[in-house]
From Swiss-Prot:
Protein name per Swiss-Prot or TrEMBL: tRNA/tmRNA (uracil-C(5))-methyltransferase
EC number: 2.1.1.-, 2.1.1.35
CDD domains: AdoMet_MTases
Swiss-Prot/TrEMBL catalytic activity: uridine(54) in tRNA + S-adenosyl-L-methionine = 5-methyluridine(54) in tRNA + S-adenosyl-L-homocysteine + H(+); uridine(341) in tmRNA + S-adenosyl-L-methionine = 5-methyluridine(341) in tmRNA + S-adenosyl-L-homocysteine + H(+)
Classification of source organism: Bacteria, Pseudomonadati, Pseudomonadota, Gammaproteobacteria, Alteromonadales
First-tier enzyme category under EC: transferase
InterPro entries, A to Z: MeTrfase_TrmA_AS, MeTrfase_TrmA_CS, SAM-dependent_MTases_sf, TrmA_MeTrfase, U5_MeTrfase_fam
GO biological process: tRNA methylation
Catalytic residues, chain numbering: 323, 357
Keywords (A to Z) from UniProt: Methyltransferase, S-adenosyl-L-methionine, Transferase, tRNA processing
Organism name: Shewanella sp. (strain W3-18-1)
Gene name linked to the record: trmA
Coiled-coil blocks: none
GO cellular component: a single term: cytosol
Binding-site positions, S-adenosyl-L-methionine: 189, 217, 222, 238, 298
Length: 365
C-alpha cells in the first residue's frame, strides 16, 4: 500500500500512465488502441482487510505502508466502499469497550456489495468460546439496526458463522440484473463497478458468436453466467469447491439453463480434451457434443500452463482476461503465432497501484 499515491486529483494522470505503459509493452503484437475503462477515484473497493492495533484502551485499524516502511492508522480508508467506511466506524465503537470481542483480535476483513450487504470477519489469536458467540450475536443485533450485516469469527482451525458466510451481490449489466453469491474468504472481483464494465465489454465483443463457449477458471460463474446469452451452450471448469458451489447457486438464481460447471482443474480438463486420461467427474458429459468455437480464460496471476495454452490455441476465438500483463505477454508470444489481437482493453480494477487488469480478444488468422 502507498497512501501517498491515493490522491483522486491525480487519478486521471495515473490511469493515462498505465494506458501508455500497456500499449508500449504490447506493441509487438500489433494490437488495436487500448480501450480504457476507468474506476471511481474513491470508494471503489468492495472488500478490505485491516490489522488491529491494541494500545491500552484504544483499538484501531492499521495497514502497512511499504513506501514509508511503517504501519499507518486507518480510521477511514479512501479506496473502500462507503458501506465499509461506515461499518469501520460503527464496529470499532462496539469493539473497544467489549473485552470478549477485542481480546487477541488481530485482523478484521470486510466484504461489501453494491446491493447493500456487508460481511465482517473477526480473526483471533485464540480459540472462540460460548461467551464470544453470545457477545458476537449481541454485536450483530446492534449493528443490524443500521446495516444488513453478518459476522464470522475465525481462529486457528475454527470458524463460527452466526448466520451465513456469504453475501449476494446484484449487478446491473446493460439491461439485465445478475445475482452473484460471494463467499467469505473466496475470490471475488474487488471493484464491482469496474467488474460490471468488464462483463459488458465481454458481452459486447462476443455478441455475434456462433456455437458454444468453453470457459476455464470460471470461479463463481461471474463471466459464464453473463455470457451465456451469447452462446448455444456454455461448459465451464473450476477447481475450488466453494467457488463451484457458489457458481451452482448463481446459475439457479439467475435462471441460466444452458450452462454446465465441471469441478476440475484446467490442466486436467486439457488432458481430458486431448483424451490422455479419463475422469469420473466427466461421466455423463459428452465433450464431443460441444461445438466450442470460442474459449474464455481468466487464469491466476501465473498465467496459463503450456498444456492448457496448447488447448486454448486450438480455438477460433480466444477471450482472455488477465490480472498480470507479464504472464499475458508470455502467453501471447505463443498465441500470436496463430491468432491476431482484435480487441484490447484496460480495466482499472486497482487504482493507485501498478496492477493492470486487461482483456484481449484473439481471432484465428
Amino acid at each position: 500500500m502507498n497512501l501517498a499515491a491515493m490522491d483522486p486529483q491525480t487519478y486521471d494522470a495515473q490511469l493515462e500512465h498505465k494506458r501508455i505503459k500497456l500499449e508500449q509493452a504490447f506493441a509487438q503484437f500489433e494490437t488495436p488502441s487500448v480501450e480504457v475503462f476507468a474506476s471511481e477515484p474513491a470508494n471503489y473497493r468492495m472488500r478490505a482487510e485491516f490489522r488491529m492495533w491494541h494500545d491500552g484502551d484504544d483499538l484501531y485499524y492499521y495497514m502497512f505502508d511499504k513506501v514509508l516502511n511503517e504501519k499507518v492508522r486507518c480510521d477511514q480508508y479512501l479506496p473502500a466502499s462507503v458501506l465499509i467506511n461506515q461499518m469501520m466506524s460503527a464496529l470499532i465503537a462496539e469493539l473497544k469497550p467489549n473485552p470478549s470481542l477485542r481480546h487477541k483480535l488481530f485482523q478484521v476483513d470486510f466484504l461489501s456489495t453494491l446491493s447493500g450487504e456487508i460481511l465482517v470477519s473477526l480473526l483471533y489469536h485464540r480459540q472462540l468460546d460460548d461467551q464470544w458467540r453470545t457477545n458476537a450475536a449481541a454485536l450483530k443485533a446492534k449493528l443490524s439496526s443500521q446495516f444488513n450485516v453478518n459476522i464470522i469469527g475465525r481462529a486457528r482451525k475454527q470458524k463460527i458463522d452466526l448466520d451465513k458466510d456469504f453475501v449476494v451481490e446484484s449487478l446491473q449489466v446493460n439491461d439485465k440484473t445478475f445475482l452473484y453469491k460471494q463467499i467469505e474468504n473466496s475470490f471475488t472481483q474487488p471493484n464491482a463497478k469496474v467488474a460490471v464494465k468488464m462483463l459488458e465489454w465481454a458481452i459486447d465483443v462476443t455478441q455475434d458468436s456462433q456455437g458454444d463457449l468453453l470457459e476455464l477458471y470460471c470461479g463463481n460463474g461471474n463471466f459464464s453466467i453473463a455470457l451465456a446469452q451469447n452462446f448455444n451452450r456454455v461448459l465451464a471448469t473450476e477447481l475450488a469447491k466453494p467457488s463451484v458451489e457458489a457458481a451452482q447457486y448463481n446459475i439457479e438464481a439467475n435462471g441460466i439453463k444452458n450452462l454446465q460447471i465441471i469441478r476440475m482443474s484446467a490442466e486436467d480438463f486439457s488432458d481430458a480434451m486431448a483424451k490422455k486420461r479419463s475422469f469420473r467427474r466427466l461421466e455423463g458429459i459428452d465433450l464431443d457434443s460441444y461445438v466450442c468455437n470460442t474459449i474464455f480464460v481468466d487464469p491466476p496471476r501465473a498465467g496459463i500452463d503450456p498444456d492448457t495454452l496448447a488447448l486454448v490455441q486450438g480455438y477460433e476465438r480466444i477471450l482472455y482476461i488477465s490480472c498480470n500483463p507479464d504472464t499475458l505477454k508470455d502467453n501471447l508470444e505463443q498465441l500470436y503465432k496463430t491468432h491476431r489481437v482484435t480487441q484490447f482493453a484496460l480495466f482499472d480494477q486497482f487504482p493507485y497501484t501498478d496492477h493492470m487488469e486487461t482483456g484481449v480478444l484473439l481471432e484465428r488468422r
